């Protein structure tokens, strides 16, 4: 039979374990969200995340349309400055936005080696 002190201690351990597990899961989610907007190939990403998200959306749409493994990575390669990105713009039927997208890619990739 458990005493009242043992019962209280057991309850505290359960709560502590729950808090630790939730904190770990939250931390994992934050790291994944932060990693999503990090692209080492785009030197001007900081301060231009809104542009990055607009351009990246093309790659996400393209990947969802064709369901080809690695399609989004190919599209993002060299900070979107590649023929796969242009192909995805046309495949997602956004050809009329190509000039704006190319300008945004130029801003994101300015200073690239």
UniProtKB/Swiss-Prot annotation:
Signal peptide: 1-35
S-S bonds: 42-79, 59-75, 62-88
Listed GO MF terms: neuropeptide hormone activity
Lineage: superkingdom: Eukaryota
Alphabetical UniProt keywords: Disulfide bond, Hormone, Neuropeptide, Secreted, Signal
Subcellular location: Secreted
InterPro entries assigned: Crust_neurhormone_CS, Crust_neurohorm, Crust_neurohorm_sf, Hyperglycemic, Hyperglycemic2
Family of the protein in this entry: Belongs to the arthropod CHH/MIH/GIH/VIH hormone family.
Purpose: Inhibits Y-organs where molting hormone (ecdysteroid) is secreted. A molting cycle is initiated when MIH secretion diminishes or stops.
Protein's name in the database: Molt-inhibiting hormone
Source organism: Carcinus maenas (Common shore crab)
